[in-house]
Amino acid sequence: MKINKNFFVENIKTFLYALIIAVIIRSLIIQPFYIPSSSMEPTLLVGDRLFVSKFSYGYSRHSFPFSVNLFKERIIFNQPQRGDVVVFKVPINIESNTRTFGVDYIKRIVGLPGDIIEMKNGKLMVNNNEVIRKKIRTDQKFLPNGKILDMEVYLEILKDGRSYETYNIRDDGPADNFNKITVPKNSYFVLGDNRDNSKDSRFVGPIPEVNLVGKAQVIFFSTKGSTILEFWKWPFELQYKRIFSLIK
């Protein structure tokens, strides 16, 4: 009986140690995320699973499970750069100050604190300068209703030379024009790469730095809809070329 009790205790200890290590890794080093929507296409596709580094921008309450309020501001902070793809807690009810965060979003930073951001007919303006974009191809997207949607693909080039692809359907959509906004201190302006299908800073406003969760780094697994556990579907749905792709 004593042996069985010791065996039970040792197994509980092993489980607790493993749980503590997992929480530390998830909170301080790296965390997996799943892409459920098309808002970051063509960079990130539905079904992509990626690793987000938690240390890239330092740490805040949102680095930890359930956003436990260990500290109010970020610590060991490193400023994000334009072009970074980031995961953040979407800000909600900021004016009422009742709850300042919601679900996890993933978007691209296009505006730093103090930047002047504007959109004119689908063209991004940063500090009164139009961001260079070059049309490189047209992709076809097959919709559930059987229709085919032509997606113009642009290469957007930032001032520092960083570039990435964006989708564009039209230049007169609901969010293709908005007046100048100066990004507040300690905040960032983010956009989805799928410009006509993204709920981003054009709708939820600038993102406070404390809401940043981490920087998207690499795609470690990708399917066309099946889960990791549905391994029997992998031969038909696994997107091999995307696995271990760096996120730029």
Predicted regions and their residues:
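Soluble "head" domains of membrane/secretory-pathway proteins
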Residues: 2-9, 24, 28, 33, ...
